[in-house]
UniProtKB/Swiss-Prot annotation:
Protein name: Small ribosomal subunit protein bS1
GO biological process, one term: translation
Native source organism of the sequence: Pseudomonas aeruginosa (strain ATCC 15692 / DSM 22644 / CIP 104116 / JCM 14847 / LMG 12228 / 1C / PRS 101 / PAO1)
CDD domains: S1_RPS1_repeat_ec1_hs1, S1_RPS1_repeat_ec2_hs2, S1_RPS1_repeat_ec3, S1_RPS1_repeat_ec4, S1_RPS1_repeat_ec6
Family named by the database record: Belongs to the bacterial ribosomal protein bS1 family.
S1 motif domain boundaries: 21-87, 105-171, 192-260, 277-347, 364-434, 451-520
Gene3D superfamilies: Nucleic acid-binding proteins (2.40.50.140)
Free-text function comment from the UniProt entry: Binds mRNA; thus facilitating recognition of the initiation point. It is needed to translate mRNA with a short Shine-Dalgarno (SD) purine-rich sequence.
Molecular function GO labels: mRNA binding; structural constituent of ribosome
Domain of life: Bacteria
One Gene Ontology CC term in the entry: cytosolic small ribosomal subunit
SUPFAM superfamilies: Nucleic acid-binding proteins
Length: 559
């Protein structure tokens, strides 16, 4: 208690008479077990429970002969005894101190001891005061743990003893303390300057640092060169730290601070330390759905994309390959210094099954595998090393197409194929099933050239023409215009399914695998051949005389 408060209190005692509720002065005459006997100049001595004389540390604060202030509860309680209370006296003293502090705009000391709606409760010399949440500090504070249980200074901003209502402010004390210091600091603060500060508060995005009357924001991205999830990984409330002033807005009194800028930037000359293709050990620091981050050195992290984790499984979740804290070998794939990004690969440090396959097998080799899946565009075959090869729809059968071609296959079937091509860079292996056998179309075309006369059976017929089965799954096309020299409006009026026809091959398109037939052309050729044969027979049937006569007559005419 200050000297003025003590004088005020003593003066108040002089003006009191010995009525119940009065604060009087007594002498401790005995301390016996659970009771303290006090002589206050009344008819009888009063006894007070000894626990009213213990401090917060559990220590007895009086001894025999000490002068104490006590409250008079009753001059005689019916048994001829005087009832006194040290607690009520202490409470009265506290109210006098609060009233004096309120009137003089001076500070009082108290302890934050609880949370209530809208703020906190503060014990000020035994009086329960209310501290609004907005008046805890000069800026909003989410976490007050570091303030609770400590003796702090407050100003009384509202006081009503009758209603037992006391409101205090810590913010007013801080603003008063910081005013002069703040002005001096604002005058001297410069960008690039290194200063000391105390961490006041932590948020998800950074920490507020008290520089001495001025708060600065240390953003989470300026705490360390490495990736961190929360500021508490680097600093704690109450820490005294050195920081660098990155930006100072004098008009708005806003200060941006940096901690990592006090050390050397690890990204300087990063490409010289980690050339593309370098293999190093790295520590996994974080997992995401799209990959994992790995630390090459303090402050330098790279991303291993999920596609660079495994040669054969492109959609594997990173947690199936690595865990946070794992030490893994990685290869540097690319460094973007400007964007501070490093692309890393794990699979590049392992044997490439595509290159292994390419070195082991050649185009034309036969290889067996198990059908893993059947899609609209082909069949995927599982091969050794965990890789797949594709039999494209067009390489399943020489004659069947679409669903017809894949109908006889199912998942899990063991299948023999021919290697058509291997592209390790694009990670593609093309396989073929139909290439296990000779191409029946090519064989047929080599035996039946253009102009050949062939026999077949009508397989299908519509108005425009017919499909002719030539045997060995070879088909020919007979258009309506090629059925007869006479005009055919509807091929169905001339041909029937199952009917045998004889026709001439008028074209073979090896690329589209189409053989065009013509009965009309065959009939024309047959007629020409018949005419030649007829003329030949007529010449042979005429005798030598007849021939000589003809020659002679011709010579005569010429003459």
């Amino acid at each position: 208690m200050s000297e003025s408060f003590a004088e005020l209190f003593e003066e108040s005692l002089k003006s009191l008479d010995m009525q119940p509720g009065a604060i009087i002065t007594g002498i401790v005459v005995d301390i016996d077990g659970d009771w303290v006997t006090v002589h206050a100049g009344l008819k009888s001595e009063g006894v007070i429970p000894v626990e009213q004389f213990y401090n917060e540390q559990g220590e007895l604060t009086i001894k025999v002969g000490d002068e104490v202030h006590v409250a008079l509860d009753a001059v005689e309680d019916g048994f001829g005894e005087t009832k006194l209370s040290r607690e009520k006296a202490k409470r009265a003293e506290s109210w006098i101190v609060l009233e004096a502090a309120f009137a003089a705009d001076e500070v009082v000391k108290g302890v934050i001891n609880g949370k209530v709606k809208g703020g906190f409760t503060v014990d000020v010399n035994g009086i329960r005061a209310f501290l609004p949440g907005s008046l805890v500090d000069v800026r909003p504070v989410r976490d007050t743990t570091h303030l609770e249980g400590k003796e702090l200074e407050f100003k009384v901003i509202k006081l009503d003893q009758k209603r037992n209502n006391v409101v205090v402010s810590r913010r007013s004390v801080l603003e008063a303390e910081n005013s002069a210091e703040r002005e001096a600091l604002l005058e001297s603060l410069q960008e690039g300057q290194q200063v000391k500060g105390i961490v006041k508060n932590l948020t998800d995005y950074g920490a507020f640092v008290d520089l001495g009357g001025v708060d600065g924001l240390l953003h989470i991205t300026d705490m360390a060169w490495k990736r961190i999830k929360h500021p508490s990984e680097i600093v704690n409330v109450g820490d005294e730290i050195d920081v660098k002033v990155l930006k100072f807005d004098r008009e708005r009194n806003r200060v941006s601070l940096g901690l990592k800028q006090l050390g050397e930037d690890p990204w300087v000359a990063i490409k010289a330390r980690y050339p593309e293709g370098t293999r190093v050990m790295a520590r996994v620091t974080n997992l995401t759905d799209y990959g994992c981050f790995a630390e090459l050195e303090e402050g330098v992290e790279g991303l291993v994309h999920v596609s660079e984790m495994d040669w054969t499984n492109k959609n594997i979740h990173p947690s199936k390959v690595v865990q946070v804290g794992d030490e893994v070998e990685v290869q540097v794939l690319d460094i973007d210094e400007e964007r501070r990004r490093i692309s890393l690969g794990i699979k590049q440090c392992k044997s490439n099954p595509w290159e292994d396959f390419s070195s082991q097998f050649n185009k034309g080799d036969r290889i067996s595998g198990t059908i893993k899946s059947i899609t609209d565009f082909g069949i995927f075959i599982g091969l050794d090393g965990g890789i797949d090869g594709l039999v494209h729809l067009s390489d399943i059968s020489w004659n069947e197409v679409g669903e017809e071609a894949v109908r006889r296959f199912k998942k899990g079937d063991e299948l023999e194929t021919v290697i058509l091509s291997v592209d390790p860079e694009r990670e593609r292996i093309s396989l073929g099933i139909k290439q296990l056998e000779d191409d029946p179309f090519s064989n047929y075309a080599s035996l039946h050239e253009k102009g050949s006369i062939v026999r077949g059976t009508v397989k299908e017929v519509d108005a425009k023409g017919a499909v002719i089965s030539l045997g060995d799954d070879i088909e020919g096309i007979l258009k309506a215009s090629e059925i007869s020299r006479d005009r055919v409006e509807d091929a169905r009026n001339v041909l029937k399914e199952g009917e045998e026809v004889e026709a001439k091959i008028i074209s073979i398109d090896r690329k589209s695998r189409v053989i065009s037939l013509s009965v009309k052309s065959k009939d024309v050729d047959d007629e020409k051949d018949a005419m030649k044969e007829l003329r030949k027979q007529e010449v042979e049937s005429a005798g030598p005389t007849t021939i000589g006569d003809l020659i002679r007559a011709q010579m005569e005419n010429q003459g």
